[in-house]
Amino acid sequence: MTQHSRDTPQFYLTAPSPCPYLPGRHERKVFTHLVGDRAGDLNDLLTHGGFRRSQSIAYRPACDQCRACVSVRVIANEFRPSRNFRKVIARNADIIGEQRSAVPTSEQYSVFRAYLDARHRHGGMADMTVLDYAMMVEDSHVETRIIEYRKRGPDSGITGRGEELIAVALTDVLSDGLSMVYSFFEPSQVSRSMGTFMILDHIARARRQGLPYVYLGYWIEGSKKMDYKARFLPQQRLAPSGWLRIDAQGDAASEPQD
């Protein structure tokens, strides 16, 4: 019998379940636990290989006869906002992004609950309680931050703090970028395009920190839920041969970038 080292990650495969993105298909995932002193290094390595983090689990799709889920990362220092993106930035000029430690609050959960009720009422997270939310935020063995997006107040120029909470992003800090784990916003503020704004803000943050990439998770061609990720260009998409550069929708480099 072979005895595995405690430092050697063990990988497991889930049973098939209905795909939440492509009707009529089933999904499977391969996953491992992110624990111990080297959890951050392992998360870095696995993210580069197309994994995503959820609490202390790193996973990626391992579906039979389907490779629709494609990992996407934006090239931060080459990104130039389009006219539409500049409009989103201008529309949210009254918003301050405040980075904090990964500590959940009742104020965050209130926005999270409203977001789920309005946009994901029948999804897998619909029944999450305040304790479930706290676990989602706190159960991390890697470098994780909360970014709160608030409206500017009369004293914001002095204190650097905003007032009403509008949106929240749970973000991992990797050796080569920022990975957006989960984000949500107040549904009454839908006209602000906060989902887009948070990605634009993360691209700007990565650039300021000298980090080359912003990881957006999976893009799925043909899924309306995932179409928005293709708009942030240039970007790289993970293929069997490595990360391929995309400069325009539908275009890909013929050689891996890394």
UniProtKB/Swiss-Prot annotation:
Signal peptide: none annotated. GO terms for biological process: proteasomal protein catabolic process; ubiquitin-dependent protein catabolic process via the N-end rule pathway. It holds the Pfam family ATE_C. GO terms for cellular component: cytoplasm. Disulfide bonds: none annotated. One of its GO terms (molecular function) is leucyl-tRNA--protein transferase activity. Keywords: Acyltransferase, Cytoplasm, Transferase. It is found in: Cytoplasm. It catalyses: N-terminal L-glutamyl-[protein] + L-leucyl-tRNA(Leu) = N-terminal L-leucyl-L-glutamyl-[protein] + tRNA(Leu) + H(+); N-terminal L-aspartyl-[protein] + L-leucyl-tRNA(Leu) = N-terminal L-leucyl-L-aspartyl-[protein] + tRNA(Leu) + H(+). Its EC number is 2.3.2.29. Its main location: cytoplasm. InterPro entries: Acyl_CoA_acyltransferase, Asp_Glu_LeuTrfase, N-end_Aminoacyl_Trfase, N-end_Aminoacyl_Trfase_C, N-end_Aminoacyl_Trfase_N. It is an enzyme of class 2 (transferase). The keyword Transferase applies. Functions in the N-end rule pathway of protein degradation where it conjugates Leu from its aminoacyl-tRNA to the N-termini of proteins containing an N-terminal aspartate or glutamate. Belongs to the R-transferase family. Bpt subfamily. NCBIfam families: PRK01305.1-3, PRK01305.1-4, PRK01305.2-3. This is Aspartate/glutamate leucyltransferase. It comes from Bradyrhizobium diazoefficiens (strain JCM 10833 / BCRC 13528 / IAM 13628 / NBRC 14792 / USDA 110).
